[in-house]
Design a protein with these regions (language model features):
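Amide-forming acyltransferase catalytic core, primarily the GNAT-like/NAT-type
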Residues: 26, 31, 128-214
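Conserved beta-strand in the GNAT
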Residues: 50, 56-65, 73-75, 80, ...
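Conserved beta-strand-loop-alpha-helix junction that forms the acyl-donor binding cleft
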Residues: 82, 111-121, 140-142
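Active-site acidic-Proline motif in GNAT/NAT acetyltransferases
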Residues: 82-84, 88, 116-117, 225-226
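Conserved active-site alpha-helix within GNAT-family acetyltransferase domains
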Residues: 88, 92, 104, 116-134
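Conserved GNAT acetyl-CoA-binding A-motif
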Residues: 102-113
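Conserved small/polar residues in nucleotide/adenosyl-binding loops
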Residues: 229-236
């Protein structure tokens, strides 16, 4: 078994390994979706690593590189082990192998997310010294099941496309800092995939949202504090 970077590994090889590693996962990605995910999350193959059994990938960690809260950061875009290699500690070996390379690249912190019910992964990360800093809720619903009940009076407003980064006040709308994949840096890596809309009352920005029409993913939605939050949010 040899651990090395994914710099010389083609996408199709990576996609096959990803598909096998996550075959029993809640969400399945096709090739186009995986490519889009890697782009958005800042995947860097030179700082991503895999354990190879001959020519076959046995386990891997795909790292995104960027900044988070002002600190150069590596983000675990995906760690997976093929079923026949599970229980061998490969994920831990890959992580330990990667750390000197990440430090030399100037990375100051490592960030990851894990499903809470994936207790095996949680245990691995805790044993590596990771601590939980916050928890996310994830909501998903089919478009056909979303109903506008019309019980909220509409506002006198205008809705138009915006560039959120040009509004210095937007971060003051937030109740929390967006996650890595929903940050402006990540959105900017795939800017053509997103639409940003602002809700204006008397030409003042009262709320905004950033979403990906192809997937229905709402990356950010926030309203100005002390505004009529429910109605502005609903307009978004």
């Amino acid at each position: 078994m040899e651990i090395k970077s994914l710099e010389k590994t083609d996408f199709n090889t990576l996609f096959r390994a990803f598909g096998r590693a996550f075959a029993d996962y809640e969400v399945q990605l096709n090739a186009e979706q995986l490519r889009a995910m890697l782009t958005r999350r800042g995947f860097d193959p030179t700082l991503s690593f895999a354990a190879f059994d001959g020519a076959q990938i046995a386990a891997f960690t795909l790292n995104g590189i960027g900044n988070f809260n002002g600190v150069p950061t590596a983000y675990d875009t995906g760690t997976g082990t093929l079923k026949e290699y599970r229980g061998t500690g490969l994920a831990t070996e890959i992580f330990r192998h990667s750390m000197p390379h990440l430090r030399r690249a100037g990375v100051g912190q490592y960030l990851l997310e894990v499903l809470q019910h994936n207790t095996g992964a949680v245990s691995v990360y805790r044993n590596l010294g990771f601590e939980t800093v916050r928890e996310f809720n994830y909501f998903c619903r089919a478009n056909t099941e979303i109903v506008d009940r019309g019980d909220t009076p509409r506002l006198p407003h205008s809705v138009r496309r915006i560039d959120p980064e040009k509004f210095a006040s937007i971060s003051s709308f937030w109740d929390f800092t967006p996650s890595w994949q929903n940050s402006f840096e990540s959105i900017g890596r795939a800017a053509g995939d997103f639409v940003s809309l602002g809700v204006f009352t008397e030409e003042e920005l009262a709320g905004y949202c950033v979403f990906e029409p192809a997937s229905g993913d709402v990356a950010q939605i926030a309203v100005k504090r002390r505004s009529e939050e429910r109605r502005v949010g609903k307009e978004c």
